[in-house]
């Protein structure tokens, strides 16, 4: 079985994007942003809120908090 290698950051952002989970993003200057991730790449995150999009550079992000519990990994009980 070939296993894809994906870093934790991409896995997290892709999960919240697919599940449309609302996030709170804190920037390094203390600004608090909320919204849903619509897209991301190696350098930035596109955040949507109230019909408006914001492009946030990853180097400016301090912390990302999902607005609800989320599961990123499959449970290990079914694995043999």
From Swiss-Prot:
Task: Look up the signal peptide feature and give its range.
Answer: none
Example GO BP: regulation of DNA-templated transcription
- The lineage's top-level taxon is Bacteria
Q: Which GO terms describe its cellular component?
A: cytosol
- Keywords, in A-Z order: RNA-binding, Stress response
Which SUPFAM superfamilies does the entry link to? Sm-like ribonucleoproteins (SSF50182)
Oligomeric form and interacting partners: Homohexamer.
The name of this protein is: RNA-binding protein Hfq
Species: Agrobacterium fabrum (strain C58 / ATCC 33970) (Agrobacterium tumefaciens (strain C58))
Q: What is the lineage of its organism?
A: Bacteria, Pseudomonadati, Pseudomonadota, Alphaproteobacteria, Hyphomicrobiales
Which gene name belongs to this protein? Answer: hfq
